[in-house]
UniProtKB/Swiss-Prot annotation:
This protein's name: Adenylosuccinate synthetase
Self-association and partners: Homodimer.
SUPFAM superfamilies per the UniProt record, alphabetical: P-loop containing nucleoside triphosphate hydrolases
Record family assignment: Belongs to the adenylosuccinate synthetase family.
Binding residues annotated for GTP, in chain numbering: 13-19, 41-43, 306, 332-334, 415-417
Binding site for Mg(2+): 14, 41
Active site residues per record: 14 (proton acceptor), 42 (proton donor)
Binding-site residues for IMP, renumbered to this chain: 14-17, 39-42, 130, 144, 225, 240, 304
Pathway assigned in UniProt: Purine metabolism; AMP biosynthesis via de novo pathway; AMP from IMP: step 1/2
Keyword hit for Transport: no
GO biological process: 'de novo' AMP biosynthetic process; IMP metabolic process
Organism of provenance: Shewanella pealeana (strain ATCC 700345 / ANG-SQ1)
Purpose of the protein: Plays an important role in the de novo pathway of purine nucleotide biosynthesis. Catalyzes the first committed step in the biosynthesis of AMP from IMP.
GO terms for cellular component: cytoplasm
Length: 431
């Protein structure tokens, strides 16, 4: 029987999920996105050629792999078409490989307008959203007024539903935020223009995945963002609007949770965060600049500079707990090359001197803590491009071993560069 594997980020996103998903899809028949939207940014480097995907699953570059956008993904038709056209220009037969759930909520222009207006109104308290309408689209979903992909296939009914929801949102835009209204006729025309094209790729995702499972075909579920951005378990309110954790697989694709075999947590060898929000181990010094520059820490979606810091074991333990992480993939180990010493956060100290080994449940709690750091010797040798453990310096091996001890979870994959082949798979999640 084939295995069903989840690949997800265990930090604040940007851990290197895209490369690992692309690598593992060699053994998968299906790759499924189950949450988020085009706020994700998954970078693939194959033989030096870089491809950045925001919405379409990272398996799209593989022959004989079906890529699925599940019902938990909020779908912007214009963003999808941009990505499809980019891939088709590169010779990728997208229509043969991509399938979409009719239950995906639609992101429409008024969602983006609302997102931007709200961030502007928050001023110094801005959350740091991508401004791509993700949050407002999820709001419409849970308030049961949202439009879904399947609604596009009845033009008359779609027009009525769109008019109702736009009347509500345009009122908010003009009267509360003092912004311009979004044009109804233009929104309707643009949405219906691609209805038939989308319909040709729609399917019952839950049924398809269940049949694939019964046939023993391996399925890979691709997470977006990271555990610490989860709407429920992240640094609320500085979070995304979906469940980025393993539990989101079942709700976001209709796949039975008992059929998941392995959860691979992607963990950078240090930590980064993009946008606002608490970050106990943040380095606002020359070491932080070194990590940011060497690690090319700029968001694949927004281009924003990421905030670097030491690896936070307290947060990682929470990620292991929430996701039932089977094993880790450690990425960007090579970025630590050249540092005299490396540090790991092993606890959070509060003003009264007590030390916690669990994370607060909201952003406010993080303001009170300072990281308790454990120092280890660094290494001067290069780990870049290493493809076997024997090529790693002893200090790097000691660092990896210490992480495994602290997390009580094995590191099964080590990534030492952006390309597919700059990876060592110690334990294959599909084996």
């Amino acid at each position: 029987m084939g295995k069903n594997v989840v690949v997800l980020g265990t930090q604040w996103g940007d851990e290197g999920k895209g490369k690992i998903v692309d690598l593992l899809t060699e053994q998968a028949k299906y790759v499924v996105r189950y949450q988020g939207g085009h706020n994700a940014g998954h970078t693939l480097v194959i033989d030096g050629d870089k491809t950045v995907l925001h919405l379409i699953p990272s398996g799209i570059l593989r022959d004989n792999v079906k890529c699925i956008i599940g019902n938990g993904v909020v779908l912007a038709p214009d963003a999808l078409m941009t990505e499809i056209n980019m891939l088709k220009e590169r010779g990728v037969p997208v229509e043969e490989r991509l399938l979409i759930s009719e239950a995906c909520p639609l992101i429409l222009p008024f969602h983006c307008a609302l997102d931007i207006a709200r961030e502007k109104a928050r001023g110094n308290n801005a959350i740091g959203t991508t401004g791509r309408g993700i949050g407002p689209a999820y709001e419409d979903k849970v308030s049961r007024r949202g439009l879904r992909v399947g609604d596009l296939f009845d033009a008359e009914l779609f027009a009525v539903k769109l008019k109702e929801v736009m009347a509500y949102h345009n009122f908010m835009l003009t009267e509360y935020y003092k912004c311009e209204a979004v044009d109804y006729e233009e929104t309707l025309k643009d949405a219906l223009a691609i209805a038939d094209y989308l319909k040709s790729m729609c399917t019952d995702v839950s049924e398809l995945l269940d049949q694939a499972r019964k046939a023993g075909e391996p399925i890979l579920f691709e997470g977006a963002q990271g555990t610490l951005l989860d709407i429920d378990h992240g640094t609320y309110p500085f979070v995304t609007s979906s469940n980025t954790t393993a539990g989101g697989v079942a709700t976001g694709s209709g796949f039975g949770p008992r059929h998941l075999d392995y959860v691979l947590g992607i963990m950078k060898a240090y930590t980064t965060r993009v946008g606002a929000g608490p970050f106990p181990t943040e380095l606002k010094n020359e070491i932080g600049d070194y990590l940011g520059t060497k690690g090319h820490e700029f968001g694949a979606t927004t281009g924003r500079k990421r905030r670097p810091g030491w690896l936070d074991i307290v947060a990682m333990k929470r990620a292991v707990q929430i996701n039932s992480v089977s094993g880790f993939c450690l990425t960007k180990l090579d970025v630590l090359d050249g540092l005299e010493e490396v540090k790991i956060c092993v606890g959070y100290q509060y003003p009264d001197g007590t030390v916690a080994t669990t994370t607060p449940l909201a952003a406010e709690g993080y303001e009170k803590v300072t990281p308790v750091l454990e120092t280890m010797p660094g290494w001067s040798e290069s780990t870049f491009g290493a493809t076997s453990v024997e090529q790693l310096p002893q200090a790097a091996l000691n660092y990896i071993k210490r992480l495994e001890e602290l997390l009580e979870t094995p590191i099964d994959i080590i990534s030492t560069g952006p390309d597919r082949n700059e990876t060592m798979i110690l334990v294959n999640p599909f084996s």
